[in-house]
Regions:
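Sequence/structural signature of beta-propeller domains
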Residues: 1, 22, 26-27, 34, ...
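Arg/Lys-rich, positively charged N-terminal/basic patches that mediate binding to nucleic acids
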Residues: 1-24
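N-terminal targeting/export leaders
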Residues: 5-8, 25-33, 39-45
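Basic/aromatic recognition patch in beta-strand/loop cores that engages polyanionic ligands
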Residues: 39-82, 87
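Enriched for short, Lys/Arg-rich terminal
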Residues: 70-110
């Protein structure tokens, strides 16, 4: 299975602020290559998924959440958001609405 991974600038910024590295990004990409549908679909977002991503030494339950969309037809995964579970559990309705608009925009561009 192949995918192109696209990191939005806001994602990259948050990724670095969380102390995650390029090696962590490679681990994330490998997880998604083995199963792009690993994340649970977030209702009302146009197909966006949320997955747990373990930070070494913390385990999955206390680590980060990665928000992404997999455009299967185009074989592209866009990384949209990342945050620690301790910072917030779920996306707000406003965030979901904004991400849905982003997905619609990305679909038009592909």
């Amino acid at each position: 299975m192949t995918r192109e991974f696209i990191y939005l600038p806001t994602f990259e910024s948050k990724w670095k602020k969380l102390g995650l590295t390029d090696d962590d990004a490679i681990r994330l990409e490998n997880e998604l290559l083995s199963n792009p549908l690993i994340g649970k679909i977030i209702e009302g977002t146009g197909g966006i998924r949320k997955m747990r991503f373990a930070i070494k030494g913390k385990g999955k339950s206390g680590s980060t959440r990665v928000i992404y969309i997999d455009f299967q037809v185009h074989k592209e995964i866009f990384f949209l958001d990342v945050y620690q579970k301790s910072d917030k559990e779920d996306l707000s309705q406003h965030e979901k609405s904004q991400l849905k608009k982003l997905v619609e925009f990305l679909e038009e561009q592909l």
